[in-house]
């Protein structure tokens, strides 16, 4: 998930938003979440959520729900989201 945080005036502001999103997604969906890029930029963040399942359909449902919840939490700050599969 690629985010643009125009309101962030410092890394502290950014960390506050990213931590809130990570905690929310972990709690609601039992997924692993990490900031994976743009760590030193105040107004950008790239966050990944990961789930493991023997059922690809179920994993897809979880990741769709994660994306929807992130969009609700972030609003227009969520620029894009993609799903990658490892077989």
Where are the regions that the model predicts?
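C-terminal structural segments of small proteins and small subunits
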Residues: 51-87
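Residue-identity detector for glutamine
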Residues: 9, 39, 43, 61-64
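Short, charge-patterned binding micro-sites
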Residues: 34-55, 86-87
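Short beta-strand elements
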Residues: 29-36, 77-83
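A structural signal for short, well-ordered beta-strand segments
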Residues: 1-3, 47-49, 81-83
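N-terminal first-folded block
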Residues: 1-28, 32, 69
